[in-house]
Each structure stands twice: as structure tokens, then as C-alpha cells.
Amino acid sequence: MTSTHFEASYLIETPLAPEAVAEVMAGEQSCGTFTRVAGETDDLRARARAQVLQVQPLGTVERPSLPNAWLARQGYGAGAHWQRARVRVAFPIANVGANLPTLAATVSGNLYDLGEVSGLRLECLDLPPDYRDQFDLPALGVAGTRRSIGAVHGAMVGTIIKPNVGLSAQQTADLVRQLCDAGVDFIKDDEVSANPAHAPLRERIPAVMRVIREHRERTGKWVMVAFNITDETSAMLRHADLVQQEGGSCVMASINWCGLSGIQSLRRHTPLALHAHRNGYGALSRDPMLGMGYQAYQTLWRLAGVDHVHVHGLQGKFAQPDAEVVESAQDCQRRLSAAQDDRVLPAFSSGQWAGTVPATWAALQSDDLLFMAGGGILAHPDGPAAGVLSIRQAWAAVREGSSLDYYAGHAPELGRALQFFGKRG
């Protein structure tokens, strides 16, 4: 990779020659169209045209992955050979500059609608470090989040406000008090609870932060709360200001619905940690021949300056296989910048409890992560405090190389969790 270009890798499917399709992709997303036009000089093409770096054939399939009217009009149907290939393209940085929405439009955009393909997926996005540094950085990232909550080592244990919706502002604050007393490091709103009529942020933020301040005064422990401020941009900025005025340290947004520009504006407006909830990512990712892989996805959002990004959880309740969850977390833990630590905190959630800790540790060999459990804490038979302790005991066990069953011999909270949740698993 050169300092003048960024590179993107794709998985494509087509009945045409993959090499020819790769050239169409490069032209469509730079200075070309379906035919050469006046003004498209050789000099302009040399400066502005994207370059195909590699086409790797992957074999054929019997039928197209996606419908395509353009290919049907060309006569491609039964009997066609649908070829798959990996394509790598280099794009001139000068075409885009430090413009995040245009970067996203360049590496994806109209490529998904190309007539020449029956499948296209953006898999990877690689940026020269100097180019990455033209974009926003996380405010806290991994190390800053640890400092904020006072967790020098070990996984950061979090939970989610449940019931998701329906609690009043005061009821939410009362639940937060219970969760703080249980010993969590982090509490977040659910993605469907932002500014509801029964618990508007103007009431919920002060009520919850009063509890957080009282807990710190009583115990010395600071608990980070991610208030869901998802909304149109100006409202998000107002809500973030209120969180900051009340002494809070984090806000959450449903990034796919707020958009890259909205999150950039939020990042540049507030020093608070941005907890990026990826709900809706499945629409971009679940079909293997369409959408966007997590490496490219998290790269774009990290350029918007988020601090934490959801990756789902191992052995969890959602559709992603464990291998994808692990790869997603590893992507978050890799630096994009050579000059600064721009790693973001992978947020594990969905069906997590003490019993999913060994697989998480085995896959990552790291506890630089946010391990969030709802039922795994709140439904522990001995109460939420025992639920939190069981998760911390599980992390202590894997760090010292012990099995959970062995460690549970002197950790009754873990033993009860294994007995209770294990029967359900």
C-alpha cells in the first residue's frame, strides 16, 4: 500500500470475466463511466482512476446469489457459469480527502448496484496510517475507558437496563442503584430506549447521574453509564451536553441510523466516550455475497471517532457464528494509526454469562473488552451481585489457567451460575 492510495478488497460473483468486472468497478468508483467521455484525458485517468491490484479466482457456483435484471437482459440465466473472485482495488486519496461519507460512498456505494455482478461484498478497507490520522480518534478508547471506571486489569463487566422500555426515570434510577451496588463497571440503555415519553432524557439523565455520584461518594467506585441519545443530530448534541453537565462519561448511539456524519458531529462536539451500538448491521452482513464485512465496517466507524463497538457474543443468542464474533473483536483491537493508540473497546453482549468467558478468553487471550450480561447477572439465583461476582470469578479462573468447575470449588457464586445457567444452555 502506498501513501497516496487506500485499498479495498471485495468478494464478487459474476458470469463475466472477473478481470473485466474488476476494471468496471475501478472505473465506476473513480473517473470512469460506461464509456469514455470528453475531458477524461489520459492525464486525468493517470491521476484519478482507481487501479485494480489483484483478481483471485475462487471457482464457480451453479446459480446466482442475487437477482439481476441487467444480466437477464444480456441473456445470462440457466447454464451460465457464475464465477466468484476476490478483487483488490486501490483508490487515490486525492479523490476523497478527509471526507468520511465520501470515503464510504467510494468503497461501497453504487458497486452494490452494478449490473455486471450477481453478488458483491466489501470485505476489507486498508488505509495508510497518515491518511487515517486525518480523521477523528476515540476520546477514551481502551485505556481511557479503563481509567474512567478504575479497572486497571481484567475484563470490564457491564449490563443493560431491563426491562428495555416502560420504566419511569425514577424507576430507571432505582434499578441503576441496584446494579451499582451489584458491582458492575458499566451500564447501558437498550437500543430501543432513547427518549421515551415515560422516561425522557431530561428527567432520566439527572435521576441516574444522582445515583452514580452518590455511589462514588459512598464507595469510591465510578460506574460508566451509556445513555442512549440516538436522535437527529442537534438533539444528540443537546443530550450529550446534559450528560456532561451532570458529570457523566459516556453516551450511546445506534450508529447505523444516526449515520457517519451524525456520529462525526457528535464526536467533535463532546469529550464523552461514544458507545457505538451496531443494531441493524445484520442487514449489511448476513448474506455472504452482499454488504460489508466487519473489518471494513468498524474501520469506517472508527474514523468517526467512536470508543466502543458492539461485536455480539460467543455462544450467544444472535445469528453470527463464533468465528465471526472473534474476528470482529480482533479487528477492534488492531491499531489503524501508527502514531496513536486508536484501538476501540469491543463490546460483547447477547446471551453472555460466566459460562461463556472461557471461549472468549481462549479466542482472544485478552481481557481488553467490555463483557456485558443481562440475564447472566440479573437472573443469577443469588441476585445481581452474585451474578457480577460469578463473571469476575470466571475471568480470574481463565487468567490463571483453571477450569470453571475447578475454580467454582472455592467460588460459590460461580458454582451457582454453572448449576443454574448451565442447565439452560
Question: What are the functions of these language-model segments?
Answer:
Residues T299, G383-G425:
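Extended, intrinsically disordered, low-complexity segments
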Residues R238-D241, E246-A373:
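Catalytic alpha/beta core domains of metabolic enzymes, predominantly
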Residues P138-I149, S193-H215, T233-M236, I255-P271, ...:
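Active-site-adjacent beta->alpha loops and helix N-cap segments on the catalytic face
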Residues Q29-S30, L44-A48, L53-T60, A199-F227, ...:
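Alpha-helix-loop-beta-strand connector modules within alpha/beta enzyme cores
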Residues L11-L16, A155-A173, V223-A235, G280-M292, ...:
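Active-site mouth loops of central-metabolism enzymes
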Residues V37-G39, F186-E191, N195, H215-V223, ...:
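Flexible, glycine/charged-enriched surface loops at secondary-structure junctions
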Residues T159, G166-S193, A199-P200, I212, ...:
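Phosphate-binding glycine-rich loops and their immediate beta-loop-alpha structural context
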Residues M1-D181:
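N-terminal capping/small domains of soluble enzymes
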